[in-house]
Design a protein with these regions (language model features):
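Conserved "right-hand" nucleotidyltransferase catalytic core of DNA-directed polymerases
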Residues: 1-30, 34, 149-153, 160-339, ...
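Conserved DEDDh/DEDDy metal-dependent 3′-5′ exonuclease domain
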Residues: 9-178, 362
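Polymerase palm active-site segment centered on the conserved acidic dipeptide of motif C
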Residues: 52, 80-83, 220-251, 428-429, ...
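Short glycine-rich phosphate-binding loop at a beta-alpha junction
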Residues: 74-86, 251, 359, 546, ...
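Conserved phosphate/anionic-ligand binding catalytic regions in large, soluble enzymes, centered on
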Residues: 109, 252-260, 316-334, 355-369, ...
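Function-dense linear segments that define catalytic or interfacial modules
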Residues: 123-124, 129-132, 142, 155-166, ...
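Conserved catalytic core of nucleic-acid polymerases
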Residues: 203, 392-547, 586, 590-600
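C-terminal structured "cap/appendage" subdomains that terminate the fold
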Residues: 526-586
Length: 600
């Protein structure tokens, strides 16, 4: 049954409908007005969904529908159970949307946010504590999502219409009764926009030069070996290590056997880690470190990786928005967040196109200055490198000292050079330091903290609570008390960093969301060299292809590269205003335009 609304819907809730094999899959859409009241229902075949969505999106522009009629109205917010479930098929059909509300992402925020005054209904809907539709296998995904212990792993959220509508009603009630609904809505809109960006970047793919990748591997490791063998330069380096250890048979890939060989050679180390090995000056150490670096490249981004993740000149990783509890993104496949610098030359634009790359200088310290209202810290970095600004202000002697001090303040370093420098920040930037110190104290006491837009940290687990209870027993030992103090300190360092890293992640989401819309407003390129491998939505217009915490890369027609660069700058400025208003903090960019995305 189809009941079309008389007015343009403010929101459209999508979900699957029950049906038989012979009927084919059907999709239900519930149209809602601005007050959340139902104004219509639509029942259509799954294959008809792209045209329906296209009609709704084009109608907002006064465009022509797929049936040829003129349409006018506001673009709706599409309510998805999970963006990776619904958006990729639309993109494959050449349809993009302006905005959505991702129920899975929003559920994770609302179930924990301190702003939600009545979270019981949302928390009780445990079916929505799940991995995204395109996540890795459970044993991999569990580490990414930080689902509360004891709740178990749920493969996917419900996608049927009634369950989706019920969750949307729960979430709407939680938002409307929150202590600051506006702040919460902003966070959920940014998080949902991030879900759209992740799907779009996977659909478009990162332009990747397979021949250049192979050339780099061959130069560093030797020619591609047959089957699973090691390349010749690695084999030669391994022999160099064995000769220096005077052990011709040691297996360098076995930590236990390698450690035994090192000790037999008089190298007294506790492990085979890079940091441990660097403490020795034995002649075997330098080639061993080189071998380990080669082995990492081969296993993480070698020829097998190239075969699996790059196809038709595109690298398509699986991004996981909100995959880290702070709101940072993770990746459940392809290693998008760990591309080594030596492979960056393989990021190559299509012919007639350019890669526009930009990263933010000192994003987290700037976010700290803005959220704490520390005008002195903001002034130190305004319009320039923040670390150099600390030197000019006389806080520290060198830029390196400034970096060590700031990172120490955000991560809770109390020893070494950082421990000696942090007190200078406390003296010069009391507001910023008070914010992170207060967050750390809350964590030590077992409390939770929130980011600027109200993403709230998870409480300590049962193991932490058990340690604290043991230390407070009348018969507690010194060892019990030491373990409790250590656990409290670890939790304090976590909450100290949570507020800063999480707020920086919110700024980055706002940057992405604004940039995505600015790029979509650029005119389509009508030249003779479309980026066909980027898919039907993006083959003729500038689009995001890569994001890493504080860095974006846009693939743009050469004629639009300067416009794309200006869009990146404007979006960064807009993100700062959106989150922090007129706070005297800027977010300067290191921006470049080229055929390759080489990072120095």
């Amino acid at each position: 049954m189809t009941s079309a609304p008389d007015q343009p819907p403010a929101a459209c809730v999508l979900g699957t409908l029950p049906g038989t094999v012979f009927e084919g899959r059907r999709i239900g859409i519930v149209d809602l007005d601005r007050e959340g009241r139902e104004i219509g229902r639509i029942d259509l075949a799954e294959e008809a969904l792209p045209d329906h969505v296209r009609d709704r999106e084009n109608g907002a522009r006064g465009g022509q529908s797929a049936s040829g009629g003129e349409q006018n109205g506001a673009r709706p917010r599409w309510v998805f159970s999970d963006t990776p479930k619904w958006y990729p098929p639309l993109l494959a059909a050449g349809v993009s949307i302006e905005r959505c509300h991702d129920l899975r992402l929003a559920h994770a925020i609302l179930a924990r946010s301190e702003l939600v005054t009545a979270p019981e209904a949302v928390r009780a809907a445990a079916d929505w504590d799940a991995a995204p539709a395109d996540a890795a296998a459970p044993e991999q995904a569990a580490a990414l999502f930080d689902v509360d212990a004891g709740r178990g792993f749920i493969p996917q959220v419900p996608h049927d219409l009634e369950a989706t509508l019920a969750e949307y009603v729960r979430q709407t009630a939680a938002i409307e009764t929150a202590s600051d609904p506006g702040r919460l809505r902003l966070l959920l809109a940014a998080e949902s926009a991030g879900g759209l960006v992740a799907a779009e970047m996977r659909a478009a793919g990162v332009p990747w030069d397979e021949a250049e990748h192979d050339r780099i591997l061959t130069e560093l490791l030797g020619p591609r070996p047959i089957r699973d063998g090691k390349p010749e330069k690695m084999l030669a380096k391994a022999e160099e290590v064995r000769a220096a250890l005077d052990d011709p048979r040691v297996n360098l890939d076995s930590p236990n056997r390698l450690l035994a060989a090192l000790r037999n050679a008089g190298i007294n180390v506790a492990s085979t880690s890079k940091w441990e090995l660097q403490t020795s000056e034995h002649p075997a150490i330098e080639p061993l470190l080189e071998y380990k670096k080669m082995a990492r490249l081969l296993s993480a981004n070698g020829w097998h990786w190239l075969d699996e993740w790059v196809d038709e000149g595109r690298y398509r990783p699986v991004y996981v928005p909100g995959g880290v509890v702070t709101g940072r993104w993770a990746a459940s496949g392809g290693g998008a967040l760990q591309i080594p610098r030596q492979l960056r030359p393989a990021l190559r634009a299509d012919e007639g196109w350019r890669l526009v790359s930009a990263d933010v200088a000192q994003l987290e310290p700037r976010a700290l200055a803005a959220m704490s209202g520390d005008r002195a810290m903001a002034a130190a970095g305004y319009g320039r490198d923040l670390y150099s600004g600390l030197v000019d202000a006389g806080v520290v002697a060198t830029r390196q000292e400034a970096k060590i001090a700031v990172l120490g303040a955000m991560y809770g370093s109390t020893t070494g050079e950082a421990g000696a420098l942090v007190p200078r920040l406390q003296q010069n930037f009391p507001a910023a330091m008070h914010l992170v110190d207060s967050a750390a104290e809350a964590g030590r006491q077992g409390g939770v903290v929130s980011t600027w837009l109200s993403r709230t940290s998870p409480p300590p687990g049962e193991g932490w609570q058990r340690l604290q209870r043991a230390a407070n027993r009348f018969d507690a030992t010194g060892a019990d008390e030491q373990r409790a103090r250590r656990a409290a300190g670890d939790q304090g360092r976590f909450t100290r960093n949570f507020v800063v890293q999480g707020t920086a992640a919110e700024w980055a989401l706002a940057w992405l969301a604004d940039l995505r819309l600015r790029l979509a407003r650029l005119p389509e390129f009508d030249g003779t060299r479309p980026a066909a491998a980027s898919g039907p939505v993006f083959s003729r217009r500038a689009h995001l292809v890569f994001f890493l915490h504080d860095e974006v890369i846009v693939h743009a027609p050469a004629e639009q590269a300067d416009q794309a660069a200006e869009a990146i700058r404007a979006a960064a400025a807009a993100a700062g205003r959106l989150l922090f208003g007129d706070a005297p903090v800027d977010f300067p960019l290191d921006l470049s335009i080229g055929e390759r995305a080489i990072k120095e």
